[in-house]
Amino acid sequence: MKRTFQPSVVHRKRTHGFRARMATKSGRLVLKRRRAKGRQRLCP
C-alpha cells in the first residue's frame, strides 16, 4: 500500500497558497479568520 502523502510543492501552492485563498470569497474568509486569530503563517 502506498502512503497517502505524496508531497508536491506545485499542488500545495495551487490548492492552499495565498493566491488560491484570495481567489475565492470563502478563501478570503479563511485568511481573515487566521489574521484575527493571530497566526504567524496565513498559508503554507
From Swiss-Prot:
Which UniProt key words apply to this protein? Ribonucleoprotein, Ribosomal protein
- Show the InterPro entries listed in the entry: Ribosomal_bL34, Ribosomal_bL34_CS
| Annotated GO MF terms | structural constituent of ribosome
The superkingdom of the source organism is Bacteria
**Could you state one GO biological process linked to this protein?**
translation
Q: Which PROSITE patterns match?
A: RIBOSOMAL_L34 (PS00784)
GO annotation, cellular component aspect = ribonucleoprotein complex; ribosome
User: NCBIfam families annotated for this entry?
Assistant: rpmH_bact (TIGR01030)
Q: Which HAMAP family match?
A: Ribosomal_bL34
Q: Which family does it belong to?
A: Belongs to the bacterial ribosomal protein bL34 family.
Question: Mind telling me what this protein is named?
Answer: Large ribosomal subunit protein bL34
